[in-house]
Amino acid sequence: MKQARRLHHIFDLKRDERLSAIGDGLEHLGTHIEQLMASIEQLLRKGQKSAAGALQAICLEESAKVLILLDITRTHDQRIARKGCDYFYSHLPRLIYAKVHSSNPADFGEIEGYLTWLRPSHYLDGPNDVDWIWRNELLRTRENALYVDYEETDDGYMWTGGDPDQFYIETAATRLVLAMKRAGLLTERGARAAAAAWKVAEFDSGTRWEFCRDKAREVLEAALPSDTVPSESLRDDVHLILEKWTFPLLSLDLKEEPVSMETLKERQDRYLSRQYGTDDYY
Protein backbone atom coordinates (compact mmCIF):
# COMPACT_ATOMS: atom_id res chain seq x y z
CA MET A 1 0.00 0.00 0.00
CA LYS A 2 1.31 3.44 -0.92
CA GLN A 3 2.23 5.59 2.07
CA ALA A 4 1.83 9.22 1.04
CA ARG A 5 2.48 12.32 3.13
CA ARG A 6 -0.95 13.42 4.23
CA LEU A 7 -0.71 15.76 7.20
CA HIS A 8 -3.41 17.90 5.55
CA HIS A 9 -5.79 15.02 6.30
CA ILE A 10 -5.94 16.07 9.96
CA PHE A 11 -8.15 18.98 8.89
CA ASP A 12 -10.68 16.47 7.58
CA LEU A 13 -11.02 15.18 11.14
CA LYS A 14 -13.26 16.59 13.83
CA ARG A 15 -11.41 18.84 16.27
CA ASP A 16 -11.31 16.21 19.01
CA GLU A 17 -9.89 13.59 16.65
CA ARG A 18 -7.43 16.11 15.23
CA LEU A 19 -5.96 16.86 18.66
CA SER A 20 -5.68 13.14 19.31
CA ALA A 21 -3.82 12.64 16.01
CA ILE A 22 -1.50 15.56 16.76
CA GLY A 23 -0.81 14.20 20.23
CA ASP A 24 0.17 10.88 18.69
CA GLY A 25 2.49 12.68 16.26
CA LEU A 26 4.10 14.64 19.09
CA GLU A 27 4.86 11.43 20.96
CA HIS A 28 6.38 9.79 17.88
CA LEU A 29 8.54 12.83 17.14
CA GLY A 30 9.62 13.18 20.76
CA THR A 31 10.82 9.59 20.89
CA HIS A 32 12.59 9.95 17.53
CA ILE A 33 14.39 13.13 18.60
CA GLU A 34 15.45 11.57 21.88
CA GLN A 35 16.95 8.60 20.04
CA LEU A 36 18.72 10.86 17.54
CA MET A 37 20.24 12.87 20.38
CA ALA A 38 21.51 9.69 22.03
CA SER A 39 23.21 8.73 18.76
CA ILE A 40 24.67 12.22 18.37
CA GLU A 41 26.17 12.11 21.86
CA GLN A 42 27.69 8.71 21.15
CA LEU A 43 29.22 9.95 17.89
CA LEU A 44 30.68 13.03 19.59
CA ARG A 45 32.26 10.86 22.28
CA LYS A 46 33.96 8.93 19.49
CA GLY A 47 35.15 12.14 17.85
CA GLN A 48 33.00 11.64 14.75
CA LYS A 49 32.00 15.28 14.42
CA SER A 50 30.95 15.16 10.77
CA ALA A 51 28.49 12.31 11.33
CA ALA A 52 27.20 14.00 14.48
CA GLY A 53 26.68 17.25 12.56
CA ALA A 54 24.62 15.50 9.90
CA LEU A 55 22.38 13.96 12.56
CA GLN A 56 22.12 17.31 14.36
CA ALA A 57 20.81 18.89 11.15
CA ILE A 58 18.15 16.18 10.88
CA CYS A 59 17.32 16.42 14.58
CA LEU A 60 16.90 20.19 14.32
CA GLU A 61 14.25 19.91 11.62
CA GLU A 62 12.44 17.11 13.45
CA SER A 63 12.34 19.42 16.47
CA ALA A 64 10.87 22.18 14.32
CA LYS A 65 8.12 19.78 13.22
CA VAL A 66 7.13 19.43 16.88
CA LEU A 67 6.84 23.21 17.21
CA ILE A 68 4.79 23.36 14.00
CA LEU A 69 2.35 20.71 15.25
CA LEU A 70 1.96 22.59 18.52
CA ASP A 71 1.32 25.79 16.55
CA ILE A 72 -1.45 24.04 14.63
CA THR A 73 -3.12 23.39 17.98
CA ARG A 74 -2.45 26.96 19.17
CA THR A 75 -3.89 28.55 16.00
CA HIS A 76 -7.69 28.56 15.97
CA ASP A 77 -8.15 30.27 12.60
CA GLN A 78 -8.20 27.10 10.51
CA ARG A 79 -7.28 28.97 7.33
CA ILE A 80 -4.02 30.00 8.99
CA ALA A 81 -3.51 26.71 10.81
CA ARG A 82 -3.54 24.81 7.52
CA LYS A 83 -0.32 26.59 6.52
CA GLY A 84 1.38 24.47 9.16
CA CYS A 85 0.93 21.41 6.96
CA ASP A 86 2.96 23.06 4.18
CA TYR A 87 5.64 24.28 6.59
CA PHE A 88 5.84 20.81 8.16
CA TYR A 89 7.25 19.44 4.89
CA SER A 90 9.49 22.38 3.85
CA HIS A 91 13.12 22.80 4.87
CA LEU A 92 13.31 26.59 5.14
CA PRO A 93 10.16 27.11 7.24
CA ARG A 94 11.37 24.39 9.59
CA LEU A 95 14.79 26.03 9.84
CA ILE A 96 13.17 29.42 10.49
CA TYR A 97 11.14 27.85 13.29
CA ALA A 98 14.34 26.53 14.83
CA LYS A 99 16.15 29.86 14.41
CA VAL A 100 13.35 31.90 15.98
CA HIS A 101 13.22 29.55 18.97
CA SER A 102 16.98 29.87 19.45
CA SER A 103 16.66 33.65 19.83
CA ASN A 104 15.00 35.88 22.41
CA PRO A 105 12.53 38.14 20.58
CA ALA A 106 11.19 40.92 22.76
CA ASP A 107 7.89 41.05 20.90
CA PHE A 108 6.11 39.62 17.87
CA GLY A 109 7.27 42.53 15.74
CA GLU A 110 10.88 41.49 16.26
CA ILE A 111 10.07 38.06 14.83
CA GLU A 112 8.45 39.72 11.82
CA GLY A 113 11.68 41.67 11.38
CA TYR A 114 13.76 38.48 11.43
CA LEU A 115 12.08 37.32 8.24
CA THR A 116 13.61 40.12 6.17
CA TRP A 117 16.97 38.33 6.45
CA LEU A 118 15.89 34.72 7.05
CA ARG A 119 13.73 34.27 3.93
CA PRO A 120 15.74 35.60 0.92
CA SER A 121 17.20 32.91 -1.34
CA HIS A 122 20.42 34.94 -1.77
CA TYR A 123 21.93 37.96 -0.06
CA LEU A 124 24.97 40.24 -0.06
CA ASP A 125 27.58 40.24 2.70
CA GLY A 126 31.20 41.11 3.38
CA PRO A 127 33.27 43.97 4.82
CA ASN A 128 31.24 46.48 2.78
CA ASP A 129 27.98 44.47 3.05
CA VAL A 130 28.02 43.96 -0.73
CA ASP A 131 31.28 42.11 -1.41
CA TRP A 132 29.97 38.56 -1.81
CA ILE A 133 26.78 36.84 -2.88
CA TRP A 134 25.66 34.07 -0.56
CA ARG A 135 22.86 31.54 -0.69
CA ASN A 136 20.31 31.54 2.13
CA GLU A 137 22.35 31.00 5.28
CA LEU A 138 19.98 28.54 6.95
CA LEU A 139 19.76 26.33 3.87
CA ARG A 140 23.49 26.60 3.21
CA THR A 141 24.34 25.51 6.75
CA ARG A 142 21.95 22.57 6.50
CA GLU A 143 23.44 21.42 3.19
CA ASN A 144 27.02 21.80 4.42
CA ALA A 145 26.19 19.53 7.34
CA LEU A 146 24.53 16.88 5.17
CA TYR A 147 26.30 16.95 1.80
CA VAL A 148 29.61 17.39 0.02
CA ASP A 149 29.22 19.36 -3.21
CA TYR A 150 31.23 21.17 -5.88
CA GLU A 151 30.19 24.80 -5.88
CA GLU A 152 30.88 28.06 -7.65
CA THR A 153 31.92 30.83 -5.27
CA ASP A 154 33.28 34.35 -5.68
CA ASP A 155 36.73 32.79 -5.26
CA GLY A 156 36.16 30.18 -7.95
CA TYR A 157 35.03 26.56 -7.85
CA MET A 158 35.62 24.41 -4.80
CA TRP A 159 34.40 21.41 -2.84
CA THR A 160 32.26 22.32 0.16
CA GLY A 161 30.39 20.56 2.96
CA GLY A 162 31.02 17.69 5.32
CA ASP A 163 33.66 19.57 7.33
CA PRO A 164 32.39 20.26 10.89
CA ASP A 165 34.77 23.23 11.11
CA GLN A 166 32.78 24.92 8.31
CA PHE A 167 29.30 24.77 9.83
CA TYR A 168 27.54 25.13 13.18
CA ILE A 169 24.17 23.53 13.94
CA GLU A 170 22.21 25.47 16.55
CA THR A 171 20.66 23.03 19.05
CA ALA A 172 18.47 25.39 21.11
CA ALA A 173 15.22 24.26 19.45
CA THR A 174 16.10 20.62 20.08
CA ARG A 175 16.83 21.34 23.75
CA LEU A 176 13.48 23.12 24.01
CA VAL A 177 11.58 20.23 22.46
CA LEU A 178 13.28 17.67 24.71
CA ALA A 179 12.35 19.82 27.71
CA MET A 180 8.77 19.80 26.45
CA LYS A 181 8.89 16.02 26.21
CA ARG A 182 10.12 15.63 29.77
CA ALA A 183 7.42 18.08 30.95
CA GLY A 184 4.68 16.01 29.33
CA LEU A 185 3.77 18.44 26.54
CA LEU A 186 4.45 16.03 23.66
CA THR A 187 1.26 14.08 24.34
CA GLU A 188 -2.42 14.34 23.53
CA ARG A 189 -2.90 16.00 26.91
CA GLY A 190 -0.22 18.53 26.01
CA ALA A 191 -1.81 19.22 22.62
CA ARG A 192 -5.20 19.80 24.26
CA ALA A 193 -3.66 22.04 26.91
CA ALA A 194 -1.96 24.17 24.25
CA ALA A 195 -5.19 24.47 22.27
CA ALA A 196 -7.17 25.51 25.35
CA ALA A 197 -4.64 28.09 26.56
CA TRP A 198 -4.48 29.84 23.18
CA LYS A 199 -8.18 29.56 22.28
CA VAL A 200 -9.02 33.26 22.59
CA ALA A 201 -5.48 34.60 22.42
CA GLU A 202 -4.90 37.66 20.26
CA PHE A 203 -1.57 39.33 19.60
CA ASP A 204 0.02 41.80 17.20
CA SER A 205 3.42 43.28 16.42
CA GLY A 206 3.60 45.08 19.74
CA THR A 207 2.70 42.12 21.94
CA ARG A 208 5.52 41.41 24.38
CA TRP A 209 7.18 38.02 24.93
CA GLU A 210 5.78 37.85 28.46
CA PHE A 211 2.39 37.10 26.87
CA CYS A 212 3.84 33.82 25.57
CA ARG A 213 5.46 33.06 28.90
CA ASP A 214 2.10 33.36 30.67
CA LYS A 215 0.41 31.16 28.06
CA ALA A 216 3.17 28.57 28.38
CA ARG A 217 2.62 28.52 32.13
CA GLU A 218 -1.08 27.80 31.54
CA VAL A 219 -0.19 24.93 29.22
CA LEU A 220 2.26 23.44 31.70
CA GLU A 221 -0.19 23.68 34.59
CA ALA A 222 -2.82 21.86 32.54
CA ALA A 223 -0.46 19.23 31.13
CA LEU A 224 1.41 18.29 34.30
CA PRO A 225 -0.47 16.09 36.79
CA SER A 226 -1.65 18.14 39.77
CA ASP A 227 0.33 15.98 42.22
CA THR A 228 3.63 16.46 40.37
CA VAL A 229 6.52 17.17 42.72
CA PRO A 230 8.99 19.12 40.57
CA SER A 231 12.57 17.88 40.64
CA GLU A 232 15.46 20.22 39.99
CA SER A 233 15.71 18.94 36.41
CA LEU A 234 11.98 19.49 35.83
CA ARG A 235 12.30 23.04 37.17
CA ASP A 236 15.08 23.62 34.65
CA ASP A 237 12.88 22.25 31.85
CA VAL A 238 9.95 24.45 32.89
CA HIS A 239 12.20 27.51 33.02
CA LEU A 240 13.50 26.79 29.51
CA ILE A 241 9.97 26.35 28.14
CA LEU A 242 8.77 29.59 29.74
CA GLU A 243 11.76 31.48 28.34
CA LYS A 244 11.92 30.02 24.82
CA TRP A 245 8.45 28.92 23.64
CA THR A 246 7.45 31.96 21.65
CA PHE A 247 4.49 33.10 19.54
CA PRO A 248 2.72 30.87 17.00
CA LEU A 249 4.36 31.56 13.64
CA LEU A 250 1.77 30.23 11.21
CA SER A 251 0.37 33.68 10.41
CA LEU A 252 3.75 34.61 8.90
CA ASP A 253 5.08 33.89 5.42
CA LEU A 254 8.03 31.57 6.04
CA LYS A 255 8.58 30.43 2.47
CA GLU A 256 11.76 31.24 0.57
CA GLU A 257 11.78 34.68 -1.03
CA PRO A 258 13.37 34.45 -4.49
CA VAL A 259 16.16 36.97 -5.05
CA SER A 260 17.81 36.93 -8.48
CA MET A 261 21.57 37.02 -8.93
CA GLU A 262 21.09 39.86 -11.41
CA THR A 263 19.41 41.99 -8.75
CA LEU A 264 22.27 41.46 -6.31
CA LYS A 265 24.92 42.15 -8.96
CA GLU A 266 23.16 45.41 -9.80
CA ARG A 267 23.36 46.39 -6.13
CA GLN A 268 27.07 45.59 -6.14
CA ASP A 269 27.58 47.72 -9.25
CA ARG A 270 25.66 50.64 -7.75
CA TYR A 271 27.80 50.46 -4.63
CA LEU A 272 31.00 50.50 -6.69
CA SER A 273 29.70 53.44 -8.70
CA ARG A 274 29.01 55.46 -5.57
CA GLN A 275 32.17 54.38 -3.76
CA TYR A 276 34.68 54.84 -6.55
CA GLY A 277 32.93 57.27 -8.84
CA THR A 278 32.96 54.93 -11.81
CA ASP A 279 29.96 56.79 -13.19
CA ASP A 280 32.36 59.62 -14.05
CA TYR A 281 33.88 57.47 -16.80
CA TYR A 282 30.63 56.93 -18.71
Give the residues covered by each predicted segment.
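Short, charge-rich amphipathic alpha-helical segments embedded
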Residues: 49-78
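Long, charged low-complexity segments
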Residues: 1-23, 28, 75-282
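Start-of-helix signal in alpha-solenoid helical-repeat scaffolds, especially tetratricopeptide repeats
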Residues: 26, 33-34, 57, 143
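Short, hydrophobic/aromatic alpha-helical segments in well-folded domains
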Residues: 36-39, 55
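Amphipathic, well-ordered alpha-helical segments in soluble domains
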Residues: 32-36, 62, 141
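Hydrophobic/aromatic side-chain positions at a characteristic register within alpha-helices
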Residues: 37, 44-45
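Conserved small-residue packing positions in alpha-helical repeats and bundles
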Residues: 40, 64, 143-145
